[in-house]
């Protein structure tokens, strides 16, 4: 069997060691004679899997005990609604940063519930960076301050945590577990699993206990209330058990790699070498301000975009899959999440160099 280097933005590459474990356990999990995908979500087997996954994630991210970790369904887009539904309380205003495609969608959704106040808008920079924080328009009062830590489509990543006294809410869908950060700075963090934590269909929410005391909007369905999910330990109904199990395996893998700090160093090396090659090239270009370049999603364009199809065809033939850019931006995108090896990035750089020699 020959596996390719998968640069998909999501669902994304899964560590091979994890896939081998899934293969070995799929028919008979730990000698029980059936798959973990077949057991009751309320049985002792899966309860053990779920609790261990939560403990491991808490340890990896140093999540204080004053936070609940929820394993929810619905993908990150559902959080665009759940956040205002649960956190607005008596406020009419929430603060947002428009840094790219995903924050823009969250802002549009928030308008159904409140007046989203833009602290700053990266559109004025053509989404190639974030305006200086000294220029942000920050109100003294608001329900929360929302931003996207890494914009997967635009290739922008925050190199800092915004300085604010407001309750900080962050979409970390594409870079959670990619570097250490201070969880205690945040009120709520959410991330879908299909980038760095496994399968689509699972979203992890880390929420401070104080926020669970806020009264949801009157029209909020019970299933969309964080407090109820926390009370029921994410077991209001049948959770996505296999995705939860796989996330737990990935948390074990991260621990075996040496933890989040070790992965952060590796991720920085991967991104740095790819950006270095692009910057030296006269054929490939990345428009993002270097300060805000994403370590997870490297976007680039060819000097002659008529060669895009040929580039993708030859890349696929060379075992480099899913490099096509997002439909809204075009061009190319190499998503190099935790599971992407340095060898995979080296193979991409080598191919790009050879392609430039032939067509540049």
Swiss-Prot record:
Modification N6-(pyridoxal phosphate)lysine occurs at: 195
Cofactor(s) needed by this chain: pyridoxal 5'-phosphate
A Gene Ontology biological process term: pyridoxine biosynthetic process
Record GO terms (molecular function): O-phospho-L-serine:2-oxoglutarate aminotransferase activity; pyridoxal phosphate binding
Signal peptide: none
Known pathway: Amino-acid biosynthesis; L-serine biosynthesis; L-serine from 3-phospho-D-glycerate: step 2/3; Cofactor biosynthesis; pyridoxine 5'-phosphate biosynthesis; pyridoxine 5'-phosphate from D-erythrose 4-phosphate: step 3/5
EC number assigned by the record: 2.6.1.52
UniProt entry keywords in alphabetical sequence: Amino-acid biosynthesis, Aminotransferase, Cytoplasm, Pyridoxal phosphate, Pyridoxine biosynthesis, Serine biosynthesis, Transferase
Gene3D superfamilies assigned: Aspartate Aminotransferase, domain 1, Type I PLP-dependent aspartate aminotransferase-like (Major domain)
Cross-referenced InterPro entries: Aminotrans_V_dom, Aminotrans_V_PyrdxlP_BS, Pser_aminoTfrase, PyrdxlP-dep_Trfase, PyrdxlP-dep_Trfase_major, PyrdxlP-dep_Trfase_small
Record's catalysed reaction(s): O-phospho-L-serine + 2-oxoglutarate = 3-phosphooxypyruvate + L-glutamate; 4-(phosphooxy)-L-threonine + 2-oxoglutarate = (R)-3-hydroxy-2-oxo-4-phosphooxybutanoate + L-glutamate
Note on cofactor: Binds 1 pyridoxal phosphate per subunit.
Binding site for L-glutamate: 42
Entry GO terms, CC: cytoplasm
Subcellular location: Cytoplasm
Binding positions (pyridoxal 5'-phosphate): 102, 152, 171, 194, 237-238
Classification via HAMAP family: SerC_aminotrans_5
UniProt record similarity statement: Belongs to the class-V pyridoxal-phosphate-dependent aminotransferase family. SerC subfamily.
Subunit structure: Homodimer.
Chain's role: Catalyzes the reversible conversion of 3-phosphohydroxypyruvate to phosphoserine and of 3-hydroxy-2-oxo-4-phosphonooxybutanoate to phosphohydroxythreonine.
Protein name: Phosphoserine aminotransferase
């Amino acid at each position: 069997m020959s596996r390719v280097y998968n640069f998909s933005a999501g669902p994304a590459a899964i560590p091979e060691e994890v896939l081998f474990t899934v293969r070995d356990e799929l028919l008979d999990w730990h000698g029980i004679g059936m798959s973990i995908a077949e057991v009751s979500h309320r049985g002792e087997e899966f309860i053990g899997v779920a609790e261990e996954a939560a403990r491991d994630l808490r340890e990896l991210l140093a999540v204080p005990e004053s936070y609940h970790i929820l394993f929810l369904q619905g993908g990150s887009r559902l959080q665009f609604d759940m956040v205002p539904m649960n956190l607005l309380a008596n406020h009419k205003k929430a603060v947002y940063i428009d840094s790219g495609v995903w924050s823009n969608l969250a802002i549009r959704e928030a308008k159904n519930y409140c007046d989203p106040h833009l602290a700053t808008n990266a559109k004025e920079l053509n989404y190639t960076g974030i305006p200086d924080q000294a220029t942000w328009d920050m109100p003294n009062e608001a329900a929360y301050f929302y931003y996207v830590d890494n914009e997967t489509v635009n290739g922008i990543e925050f190199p800092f945590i915004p300085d604010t006294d407001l309750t900080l809410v962050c979409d970390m869908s594409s870079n959670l577990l990619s570097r250490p950060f201070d969880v205690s700075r945040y009120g709520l963090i959410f991330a879908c699993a299909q980038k760095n934590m496994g399968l689509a269909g699972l979203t992890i929410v880390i929420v401070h206990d104080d926020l669970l005391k806020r009264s949801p909007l009157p029209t909020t369905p019970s299933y969309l209330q964080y407090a109820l999910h926390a009370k029921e330990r994410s077991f209001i109904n049948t959770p996505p058990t296999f995705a939860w199990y796989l996330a737990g395996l990935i948390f074990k893998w991260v621990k075996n790699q040496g933890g989040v700090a070790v992965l952060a160093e590796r991720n920085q090396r991967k991104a740095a070498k790819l950006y270095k090659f692009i910057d030296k090239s006269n054929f490939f270009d990345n428009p993002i301000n270097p300060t805000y370049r994403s370590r997870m999603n490297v976007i680039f364009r060819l000097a002659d975009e008529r060669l895009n199809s040929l580039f993708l065809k030859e890349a696929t033939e060379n075992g480099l899959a899913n490099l096509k850019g997002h439909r809204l931006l075009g061009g190319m995108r190499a998503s190099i999440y935790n599971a992407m090896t340095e060898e995979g990035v080296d193979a991409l750089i080598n191919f790009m160099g050879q392609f430039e020699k032939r067509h540049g």
